[in-house]
């Protein structure tokens, strides 16, 4: 009766019970005769497969040594080739506790599974799952190896946070993706004192890491940080903590910068924003004498023991000088009460008028000037009648000059200006029928042209006035000073053609003037 092919379980049983065959050459084992047990050449080759080491080499090796060869050594070839997971052996377990090694980013973290550097217990479980059948069954070639399903790794942010809190517990074991031979040189240097490498948070932007990193980890940074990163307590306190209002006394400190510590802030602010008050004990005459002496004295004499505010006040007066050096009380008076060059106050008493930027005088003032009341103070008193010629011929103030065109006024006053002598003033008064439009416009024009022709604040005619109410009001109050003593209004029925002619001429000249000014401005640009 012929025997059929032997089942696989019987072949395992025969291998376990039969003694090891006698050592014979490899070629003989491959092509020799069947064994005494009646095994076929294929079965004999299967039995003696674990004894083959290479052609021409001896296979005399005990079974215990063969089994021990399956144990992982300090440098695992399977780890270096990337075919199997690896866990730290007895050679490098102590050194890895002192100097952790960064994993070479050869694959994305999700594909490598949970790194043993994060959880030691998980690495032990992986090692146990892979190598738990070594001691139970010696014939590993007939069993199929299955990798453990990888799980989601922890994010970098969590690794950094827990690594700082737990110390070296996170890096107690070497990561599987780094070969053991790469730790040989670094571990020896790390054992020396002063050569320990501190753990630093690493980023793929760093030049040293970009050379070795293949870019897989950058794809997972954003997702890991969104899901696993928690808000720090310091940031949470910004939303939950109550608001605290703190008032800083910056103004007080700024005020006390040049003051004594005992000085109050209110008095300092008052001294900064307000003009220094004059002492009640000083008389106007005494202060005037003191100012004159300081203005003409040397720097040594000016540094006399006085109040600091008075010294600053006197220095400002000495710096500002008029053509004759007679500017006084400039800080004690309102600039609006000073004439155009700020050298002195107005001579006449002014009244309120239609235009606030101009000074108006009453008809009685002009009457007093014509009567010679201010002869010792005035060198020249000029009255400019800005009405049209037919109005001027119908009645005007004695001594007035009829100039209704701006170019005529500029030719009369500014081409050959009147120079004051002996401290006497030159006063110019403008008026029209009501002193509401033509007179004020002519007064502004003269001041504007005078400013352009002189260095500020010097002026040829610093004192200008406008007659309040115009010629109509002057005629009603002071008819005796009018020649002829009559009044002809602008809208007279007999002079409609003259009115139309002069108005057209004035508007045309005004338009040409505006064009000339526009051209001059364009040339300056």
UniProtKB/Swiss-Prot annotation:
E.C. numbers: 3.1.3.48
Motif (Phosphodegron): 73-83
Catalytic activity: O-phospho-L-tyrosyl-[protein] + H2O = L-tyrosyl-[protein] + phosphate
SUPFAM superfamilies for this protein: Rhodanese/Cell cycle control phosphatase (SSF52821)
PANTHER family: M-PHASE INDUCER PHOSPHATASE 1 (PTHR10828:SF46), M-PHASE INDUCER PHOSPHATASE DUAL SPECIFICITY PHOSPHATASE CDC25 (PTHR10828)
Role this protein plays: Tyrosine protein phosphatase which functions as a dosage-dependent inducer of mitotic progression. Directly dephosphorylates CDK1 and stimulates its kinase activity. Also dephosphorylates CDK2 in complex with cyclin-E, in vitro.
Protein name in UniProt: M-phase inducer phosphatase 1
Organism: Bos taurus
Gene that this polypeptide is encoded by: CDC25A
């Amino acid at each position: 009766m012929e025997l059929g092919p032997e089942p696989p379980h019987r072949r395992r049983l025969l291998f376990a019970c039969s003694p090891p065959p006698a050592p014979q050459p490899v070629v003989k084992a491959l092509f020799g005769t069947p064994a005494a047990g009646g095994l076929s050449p294929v079965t004999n080759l299967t039995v003696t497969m674990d004894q083959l080491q290479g052609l021409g080499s001896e296979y005399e090796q005990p079974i215990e040594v063969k089994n021990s060869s399956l144990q992982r050594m300090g440098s695992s070839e399977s780890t270096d080739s990337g075919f199997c997971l690896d866990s730290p052996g007895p050679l490098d377990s102590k050194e890895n506790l002192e100097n952790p090694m960064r994993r070479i980013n050869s694959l994305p973290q999700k594909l490598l599974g949970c790194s043993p550097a994060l959880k030691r217990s998980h690495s032990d479980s992986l090692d146990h799952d892979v190598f738990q059948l070594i001691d139970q069954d010696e014939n590993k070639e007939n069993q199929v190896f299955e990798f453990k399903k990888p799980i989601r790794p922890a994010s970098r942010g969590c690794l950094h946070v827990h690594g700082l809190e737990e110390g070296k517990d996170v890096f107690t074991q070497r990561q599987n993706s780094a070969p053991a031979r790469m730790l040989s040189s670094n571990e020896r240097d790390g054992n020396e004192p002063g050569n320990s490498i501190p753990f630093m948070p690493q980023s793929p932007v760093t030049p040293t890491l970009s050379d070795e990193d293949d870019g897989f980890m950058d794809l997972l940074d954003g997702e890991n940080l969104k899901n696993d990163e928690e808000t720090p307590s310091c940031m949470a306190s910004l939303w939950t903590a109550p608001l605290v209002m703190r008032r800083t006394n910056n103004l007080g400190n700024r005020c006390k910068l040049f003051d004594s510590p005992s000085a109050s802030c209110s008095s300092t602010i008052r001294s900064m924003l307000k003009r220094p008050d004059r002492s009640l004990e000083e008389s106007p005459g005494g202060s005037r004498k003191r100012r004159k002496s300081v203005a003409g004295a040397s720097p040594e004499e000016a540094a006399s023991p006085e109040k600091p505010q008075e010294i600053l006040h006197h220095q400002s007066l000495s710096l500002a000088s008029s053509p004759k050096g007679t500017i006084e009380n400039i800080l004690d008076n309102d600039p609006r009460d000073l004439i155009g060059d700020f050298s002195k106050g107005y001579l006449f008493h002014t009244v309120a008028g239609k235009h606030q930027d101009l000074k108006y005088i009453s008809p009685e003032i002009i009457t007093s000037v014509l009567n010679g009341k201010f002869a010792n103070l005035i060198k020249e008193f000029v009255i400019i009648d800005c009405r049209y010629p037919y109005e001027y011929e119908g009645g005007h103030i004695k001594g007035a000059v009829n100039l209704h065109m701006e170019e005529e006024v500029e030719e009369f006053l500014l081409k050959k200006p009147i120079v004051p002598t002996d401290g006497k003033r030159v006063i110019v008064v403008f008026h029209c029928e009501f002193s509401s439009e033509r007179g004020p416009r002519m007064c502004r024009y003269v001041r504007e042209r005078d400013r352009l022709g002189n260095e500020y604040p010097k002026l040829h005619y610093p004192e200008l006035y406008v007659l309040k109410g115009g010629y109509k009001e002057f005629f009603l109050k002071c008819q005796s000073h009018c020649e002829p003593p009559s009044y002809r209004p602008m809208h007279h029925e007999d002079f409609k053609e003259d009115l139309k002619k002069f108005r057209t001429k004035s508007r045309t000249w005004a338009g040409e003037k505006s064009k000339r000014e526009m051209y001059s401005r364009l040339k300056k640009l």
